[in-house]
Amino acid sequence: MADLVNEFSWSRSRDKLFQDCRRKYFYHYYGAWGGWEADAPEEARALYVLKQLSSRQQWAGKVVHEGVEWVLRALFEGRDLPEAWLVDETVRRMRREWKASNERQYWTTPKSGGLFEHEYKIPVKPQDWQQLRDHVVRCLRNFYRLPLLSDIRKTPRERWVMIEEIRSFDFDGTPVYGAPDFAYWTEGDRLALVDWKTGAPDPDSTALQLGCYALYAREVLRVDPGRVELLEVNLREGAVQSHPWDEGRLEEIRGHLQLSIRSMRAYLQDPAANLALMDNFEKTEDLRICRWCNFRSVCRPDL
């Protein structure tokens, strides 16, 4: 098997991390590279373990997304996962993962990931963990009650778009990862691109994310913005919001990507080889970001 190559690419999460802190960006995409190998240098291994950490809110979102994916995958295969089974299995999974994280097992099996709160010994009351579980259960129950799910159930499987087959597309020579969570063709012959949300609304972030979905539809699926329905699904509230899009707004997204990619490449020692040197990536001066950074113990251990 050929060695993995650290290829430069763009995604919304990469863009956000770059804006938050250049040093954090370096640790995540360059310093941690290869840290999964058994014989990785100690520093790369530590950075890789820290990179895999999630806050408890991020963990909850991931659990919900994967639960929804289970349901949709089963439907595609002609099966129906009962709501009660999914809720029970998800809660059991959360207990297993919480226990493994609390025991810091992620330091020996880093790909499994751990919780930021456990690594940095952040006090969390038992009732707060229970509220997190209740939040996940609420999101899953709301998913089952969405009229949107009824529409998806009625849609012939050949009109589902298999997103996992094409996760990225080329944008001016850079791979861009911006695929939606789910997509299907509606009865009105419009392409519905779905984004599952579990947290508080963030209009700016959502606009960029949905714009990337519209760009994905144009570049990968060859569908014009006018035929696309961008659906933001708030599972916490059980609400669906449709966002209109047009060619003008798509141009704004292209402009954002071009500027972001140029800025990231400007920090590289050798852009063609995607070679980065840590000293070229400054630390943020906003200590509020530092306190909740996965790499705090390496970068600002005094906090």
PLM regions with names:
Residues F8, R12-L17, L50-Q58, K62, ...:
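Short, charged/polar micro-motifs that form catalytic or ligand-binding hotspots
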Residues D15-D39, D170-A183, Q258-S263:
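An acidic intrinsically disordered interaction segment
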Residues D3-S9, H28-K51, E119, D189-V194, ...:
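Short amphipathic alpha-helical segments and their helix-coil junctions
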Residues G67-V161:
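A non-catalytic, helix-rich entry segment at domain boundaries
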Residues G31, W196-A200, N234, E247:
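A short beta-strand motif that forms part of the nucleic acid-binding face
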Residues R145, D172, S205, E219-L303:
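Metal-dependent nuclease catalytic regions and adjoining charged, substrate-binding loops involved
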Residues D15-G31, A40-F76, V87, V91, ...:
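Nuclease catalytic cores
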Residues W36-A40, R157-R218, A272:
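Non-catalytic protein-protein interaction segments used by genome-maintenance enzymes to assemble
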